[in-house]
Amino acid sequence: MADSLKMGNLSLNESQHAPAPAPSTGRAAYIPPHLRGRQMGGNMDGAAAAAPPPGPAAGPGNSWGGPRGGPRGGQWANANAPDFSPRGPNGNTSWSPHEARRPFNPNAYGHPGHGGSYGSGGGSARGSGDGQWRDGKHIPGPANPRLERELFGLPNDPTKQNTGINFANYDDIPVEASGHDVPEPVNAFTNPPLDDHLIENIKLAHYQTPTPVQKYSIPIVMNGRDLMACAQTGSGKTGGFLFPILSQAYQNGPSAAPAQAGGQFGYGRQRKAYPTSLILAPTRELVSQIFDEARKFAYRSWVRPCVVYGGADIGSQLRQIERGCDLLVATPGRLVDLIERGRISLVNIKYLILDEADRMLDMGFEPQIRRIVEGEDMPHVNDRQTLMFSATFPRDIQMLARDFLKDYVFLSVGRVGSTSENITQKVEYVEDHDKRSVLLDILHTHGTSGLTLIFVETKRMADSLSDFLLNQRFPATAIHGDRTQRERERALEMFRSGRCPILVATAVAARGLDIPNVTHVINYDLPTDIDDYVHRIGRTGRAGNTGIATAFFNRGNRGVVRDLIDLLKEAHQEVPSFLESIAREGSGYGGRGGRGGRGRGANATRDMRRMGGGMGGPPSFGGSSYGAPGGSYGGGGGGSSSYGAPPSYGGGGGYGGGGSYGGGYGNPSGPTGPSSWW
């Protein structure tokens, strides 16, 4: 009886691993276990079912005809086979498909090999949907309700950011746009200038009105101009560059990839990707966040966004790129790695975006950025559009713009480098040994109804403080640079969802992260850089919502007291009397002015082309040491350096100097002391 028993299409008296008998027309092809119910229609009565007919049976995105679109873009592809034939889950290359291979369609989603998308046979899904570029037109794919819920959430979804009660006040923020022939701003998401498909996705994201930075950046980019934009943190900078570049992609279609010599695996599949848009950002969390936003607005389009960053499996990132890459979001280090491996070419880049450019330079990425922009195959500055976005643009970053941008528009929305008036700032005098008890008082007072973000300076303190809070029955988790990428992503997800409403973080999470519904930011340890303080508290009060920021201050933080007072006054916040007192008694300390002294000078957010020193020539490093008293960058006196203005808070100024807190990297012994490591 067992000899005649068949389960589905698998016969017990026929070994699938034994030598095959002579071909028989009565035997059906092997069907994987998870497909048997669908293919057999639940036929378990012993009758062998007919094999499925050859030809495209399962719809787009299916590399071997399984359900639900199959393993998208060739997930089971066998890289060792010359034709990229599929293989089984155990790596057995003898597993043959149960349908005839479909011919490569050169018209599927934008010509073979375009943008690193490799015609894997039948219009595989691109981007967050399966739109196509065909006959010079953008054809959006069908709606996908499950993916829509994942990307855009349900109405009133607490994990998705909505505009707050003060969002309309953004219209009162002053805007400075400098440059010649600046395009007029737009006041709504309309066509023109935006593409209709992008407008549909913007509506799905529940965006009603463009923010000030978007009102100006959309027409500027759509008119082909380079842009350097500064705006309040949380004011929509990501949309400011994604909206125009995606809209133009939908209107203009893909660019053909250059012919490759022996670089194809077959059937149009290429080894090297040719993205048309490149977005560089400093941290893993920020590039992941930008990628998530790009997926939203590329939904149902032909554009396929990809993300690459260090600290994650490079193999999975390579497979993602091989399935198609039109818009690439990357950290500089990992991008250089992939360029060296020959897996990404920048020759097709139309749009280069540098997000949080000042932080990338602070983190030491300038050599990699210059290599990417100037040392590889990226088009010349005159043959691409370059956009720089950040919440602060000090003078040295504006000098970098001289090399990367052409005839750019400088856009300053609000007083950049300042804080939002939507944030209520409180400064408490707390000695180090009292911080834990004061923190518990604050948490008991405010409760855990909203999300609370606590910033500390060291990784050890992040772990120690989160353990302490857990022992005090507060649901807390920590995120810092020593945690693995998976641990960091899990901690952020638990925080975003509200399952763990207290997050203790180092500076790794301070800038750029858009975490909805953070109602309270606590600076347990104040940073030494006032710009870091601005970006930390900018995690609350986003998109017009209100928030609270509390800072623990003591005499160990007197290096930032002057900048902190200016910041509080600027945002119309209460200035505690102890801050004024410490500022008066500590006049010898001065303000450090940020990392290496490049922080909040009086002109740190102005277009340097309009200042007296102009943009002419690199800074003068001769004449004295880096910290010559009075000179901006050691140019030898008051206004003689090429930046044309002394630092705001002297004490050595610039990159160092003789004052006690004169600068981060100068000669602590002063200009007459022994030479420093510079």
From Swiss-Prot:
Residues 218-411 form the Helicase ATP-binding domain. A motif (Q motif) lies at residues 187-215. It is found in: Cytoplasm. Residues 668-678 have a biased composition (Low complexity). Residues 1-159, 584-678 are annotated as: Disordered. Residues 422-583 form the Helicase C-terminal domain. The keyword GTP-binding does not apply. Its EC number is 3.6.4.13. It comes from the Eukaryota. It catalyses: ATP + H2O = ADP + phosphate + H(+). Residues 62-73, 112-130, 587-600, 611-641, 649-667 have a biased composition (Gly residues). GO terms for molecular function: ATP binding; ATP hydrolysis activity; eukaryotic initiation factor 4G binding; G-quadruplex DNA binding; G-quadruplex RNA binding; mRNA binding; RNA helicase activity; RNA strand annealing activity. ATP binds at A231, Q232, T233, G234, S235, G236, K237, T238. GO terms for cellular component: cytoplasmic stress granule; spliceosomal complex. InterPro entries: DEAD/DEAH_box_helicase_dom, Ded1/Dbp1_DEADc, Helicase_ATP-bd, Helicase_C-like, P-loop_NTPase, RNA-helicase_DEAD-box_CS, RNA_helicase_DEAD_Q_motif. The Q motif is unique to and characteristic of the DEAD box family of RNA helicases and controls ATP binding and hydrolysis. This is ATP-dependent RNA helicase ded1. The gene is ded1.
